[in-house]
Amino acid sequence: MTNIRKTHPLMKIVNGSFIDLPAPSNISSWWNFGSLLGICLILQILTGLFLAMHYTSDTMTAFSSVTHICRDVNYGWLIRYLHANGASMFFICLFIHVGRGLYYGSYMFMETWNIGVILLFAVMATAFMGYVLPWGQMSFWGATVITNLLSAIPYIGTDLVEWIWGGFSVDKATLTRFFAFHFILPFIIAALAGVHLLFLHETGSNNPSGLSSDTDKIPFHPYYTIKDILGALILILALSSLVLFSPDLLGDPDNYIPANPLNTPPHIKPEWYFLFAYAILRSIPNKLGGVLALVFSILILALMPFLHTSKQRSMMFRPISQCLFWLLVADLLTLTWIGGQPVEHPFVIIGQLASILYFTLILILMPLASLMENNLLKW
């Protein structure tokens, strides 16, 4: 008799995806972050669901309802901080996951990669709207500043912003719709993640060498299930440490002040995971130019398959490209630091130079380095 695992319509899908899936024998810990992102998403949906049971999306009571969750709801403080810091862990895993894809040439799986870029945009949109919900000072002013960027779009800009606001400023209508979108988007993200996996399983996983691993496959279970569980334990340990010892480490103290449209905070800045893009936005003095640079800083990922000029897929055997990759990582860390600094000398010029370097590295230097390495192969 054939195992039910291989015949049952539902079990068959699970079996093909997580049990009997043929996986390369040499994928490193950098391949753990896909499963960690899945865990983060499940955690965010569950904690978010319990928060939504006690949260009210009204400008008069939103801030109070979050205070109520932290003070009066059983383990409400834990749920709230797991959700807030879970977002930070989500983005850490996301950035590493994307970085892994860039380093090892995973972007050559076009469908998987493009769905991934869409997922990145969806997660960023969700995180932004979630940050508005507690209705603190940074929530309100962050929402005002970021939505206002759309007014830079010629002709339709102003109408578009007022349509998103549901009025002439960020107010009750804005908060209510942001809550609605913040609730629905994670489920859309989960569906997209399913499609992401579907496309991945059409080709099979890439591996550190960038070579075909068809001749050397091992079953996903038990080898990678146990490896993913280890990764999950480390993730849970890191998140628990953050939540229980310094839950406000990555947050902004200004968000403990209720939103006040009449009082602008001295430094409006987003959460740490958006600072690199915020620095690129601020480094261009023109509003529309800044918005385009902001969008393109993420959208540039979609161009990666077309900018690949190397004869090899992975950077494993390409030392010049490796140096440029780590320079790009350092540049992004610099941009993250600059995004959190006030707009004054020397931060402005550092931000502008880092922004120029970011685009130059991806669009010019890395493709040129790949061509150079191709020629070095002939020696």
Curated annotation (Swiss-Prot):
<keyword id="KW-0408">Iron</keyword>
<keyword id="KW-0349">Heme</keyword>
<feature type="transmembrane region" description="Helical">
    <location>
        <begin position="33"/>
        <end position="53"/>
    </location>
</feature>
<keyword id="KW-0812">Transmembrane</keyword>
<keyword id="KW-0679">Respiratory chain</keyword>
<comment type="similarity">
    <text>Belongs to the cytochrome b family.</text>
</comment>
<dbReference type="GO" id="GO:0005743">
    <property type="term" value="C:mitochondrial inner membrane"/>
</dbReference>
<dbReference type="InterPro" id="IPR016174">
    <property type="entry name" value="Di-haem_cyt_TM"/>
</dbReference>
<dbReference type="InterPro" id="IPR036150">
    <property type="entry name" value="Cyt_b/b6_C_sf"/>
</dbReference>
<keyword id="KW-0999">Mitochondrion inner membrane</keyword>
<dbReference type="InterPro" id="IPR005798">
    <property type="entry name" value="Cyt_b/b6_C"/>
</dbReference>
<feature type="binding site" description="axial binding residue">
    <location>
        <position position="97"/>
    </location>
    <ligand>
        <name>heme b b566</name>
    </ligand>
</feature>
<keyword id="KW-0472">Membrane</keyword>
<feature type="transmembrane region" description="Helical">
    <location>
        <begin position="347"/>
        <end position="367"/>
    </location>
</feature>
<dbReference type="InterPro" id="IPR027387">
    <property type="entry name" value="Cytb/b6-like_sf"/>
</dbReference>
<feature type="transmembrane region" description="Helical">
    <location>
        <begin position="113"/>
        <end position="133"/>
    </location>
</feature>
<dbReference type="GO" id="GO:0045275">
    <property type="term" value="C:respiratory chain complex III"/>
</dbReference>
<dbReference type="GO" id="GO:0006122">
    <property type="term" value="P:mitochondrial electron transport, ubiquinol to cytochrome c"/>
</dbReference>
<dbReference type="Pfam" id="PF00032">
    <property type="entry name" value="Cytochrom_B_C"/>
</dbReference>
<dbReference type="InterPro" id="IPR030689">
    <property type="entry name" value="Cytochrome_b"/>
</dbReference>
<feature type="binding site" description="axial binding residue">
    <location>
        <position position="196"/>
    </location>
    <ligand>
        <name>heme b b566</name>
    </ligand>
</feature>
<dbReference type="InterPro" id="IPR005797">
    <property type="entry name" value="Cyt_b/b6_N"/>
</dbReference>
<keyword id="KW-0479">Metal-binding</keyword>
<comment type="subunit">
    <text>The cytochrome bc1 complex contains 11 subunits: 3 respiratory subunits (MT-CYB, CYC1 and UQCRFS1), 2 core proteins (UQCRC1 and UQCRC2) and 6 low-molecular weight proteins (UQCRH/QCR6, UQCRB/QCR7, UQCRQ/QCR8, UQCR10/QCR9, UQCR11/QCR10 and a cleavage product of UQCRFS1). This cytochrome bc1 complex then forms a dimer.</text>
</comment>
<feature type="transmembrane region" description="Helical">
    <location>
        <begin position="226"/>
        <end position="246"/>
    </location>
</feature>
<keyword id="KW-1133">Transmembrane helix</keyword>
<dbReference type="InterPro" id="IPR048260">
    <property type="entry name" value="Cytochrome_b_C_euk/bac"/>
</dbReference>
<dbReference type="GO" id="GO:0008121">
    <property type="term" value="F:ubiquinol-cytochrome-c reductase activity"/>
</dbReference>
<feature type="binding site" description="axial binding residue">
    <location>
        <position position="182"/>
    </location>
    <ligand>
        <name>heme b b562</name>
    </ligand>
</feature>
<keyword id="KW-0830">Ubiquinone</keyword>
<dbReference type="Pfam" id="PF00033">
    <property type="entry name" value="Cytochrome_B"/>
</dbReference>
<feature type="transmembrane region" description="Helical">
    <location>
        <begin position="77"/>
        <end position="98"/>
    </location>
</feature>
<keyword id="KW-0249">Electron transport</keyword>
<feature type="binding site" description="axial binding residue">
    <location>
        <position position="83"/>
    </location>
    <ligand>
        <name>heme b b562</name>
    </ligand>
</feature>
<keyword id="KW-0496">Mitochondrion</keyword>
<feature type="transmembrane region" description="Helical">
    <location>
        <begin position="320"/>
        <end position="340"/>
    </location>
</feature>
<feature type="transmembrane region" description="Helical">
    <location>
        <begin position="178"/>
        <end position="198"/>
    </location>
</feature>
<dbReference type="InterPro" id="IPR048259">
    <property type="entry name" value="Cytochrome_b_N_euk/bac"/>
</dbReference>
<comment type="function">
    <text>Component of the ubiquinol-cytochrome c reductase complex (complex III or cytochrome b-c1 complex) that is part of the mitochondrial respiratory chain. The b-c1 complex mediates electron transfer from ubiquinol to cytochrome c. Contributes to the generation of a proton gradient across the mitochondrial membrane that is then used for ATP synthesis.</text>
</comment>
<keyword id="KW-0813">Transport</keyword>
<protein>
    <recommendedName>
        <fullName>Cytochrome b</fullName>
    </recommendedName>
</protein>
<dbReference type="GO" id="GO:0046872">
    <property type="term" value="F:metal ion binding"/>
</dbReference>
